[in-house]
Amino acid sequence: MKLLEERIKKDGVVLPGNVLKVNQFLNHQIDPELMYKMGEEFARLFKDEEITKIITVESSGIAPAVMTGLVMKLPVVFARKHKSLTLVDNLYTSDVYSYTKKVTNTISVDKKFLTSDDKVLVIDDFLANGQAVQGIFNICDAAGAEIKGVGIVIEKSFQEGAKIIHDRGVRLESLAVISSFDDNQVHFEGEE
């Protein structure tokens, strides 16, 4: 998605450890117009799939997931990372290691929001080592839900995340695919 790539080039900051900071429009401050355009693109890419629900992990996956849900007219569920007084039992859970935060969270989804009748589209902000997506896969497997596809805003193709998805035979669509951060610059796949 050219618009997203341009925004990453303009506002993204490469940090040590192959981390891309996109706080200007995705991970702290949100650009709703850009999120909506991403939602439209995910909806276009997955329009022929029989999806009943969109699922993501809090918190940065929520904005693109909600916009995709808005365009596709589908409910959105997000896996919670933190315990809550309102979310205590009857949960699907999975442990997820965060590449950028270097911590393990137990994500959870209330069983009433994900069932074996669901055909889900996973939407998330980044795909690096694939741990968040693997956690969602674990939750969907426990629920008996069918995973129809994964939509990623920014994929780092030089890390292992895509392999986890492809090994499952699940369709992956990424709006921006980064091939490297050479010289602290973002380089996209297909660039010369």
UniProtKB/Swiss-Prot annotation:
Record EC number: 2.4.2.22
Metabolic or biological pathway, per its Swiss-Prot or TrEMBL entry: Purine metabolism; XMP biosynthesis via salvage pathway; XMP from xanthine: step 1/1
InterPro entries membership: PRibTrfase_dom (IPR000836), PRTase-like (IPR029057), Pur/Pyrimidine_PRTase (IPR050118), Xanthine_PRibTrfase (IPR010079)
Protein name (database record): Xanthine phosphoribosyltransferase
Gene Ontology terms: biological process: purine ribonucleoside salvage; xanthine metabolic process; XMP salvage
Catalyzed chemical reaction(s): XMP + diphosphate = xanthine + 5-phospho-alpha-D-ribose 1-diphosphate
Species lineage: Bacteria, Bacillati, Bacillota, Bacilli, Lactobacillales
Role of this protein: Converts the preformed base xanthine, a product of nucleic acid breakdown, to xanthosine 5'-monophosphate (XMP), so it can be reused for RNA or DNA synthesis.
Binding site for xanthine: L20, N27, K156
UniProt keywords, alphabetically: Cytoplasm, Glycosyltransferase, Purine salvage, Transferase
Subunit-structure text: Homodimer.
Origin: domain of life: Bacteria
Signal peptide residues on this chain, from the entry's feature table: none
Residues engaged in binding 5-phospho-alpha-D-ribose 1-diphosphate: A128, N129, G130, Q131, A132
Compartments where found: Cytoplasm
Species name: Ligilactobacillus salivarius (strain UCC118) (Lactobacillus salivarius)
Major place of residence: cytoplasm
GO molecular function, one term: xanthine phosphoribosyltransferase activity
GO cellular component, one term: cytoplasm
Similarity-based family: Belongs to the purine/pyrimidine phosphoribosyltransferase family. Xpt subfamily.
Enzyme superclass (EC): transferase
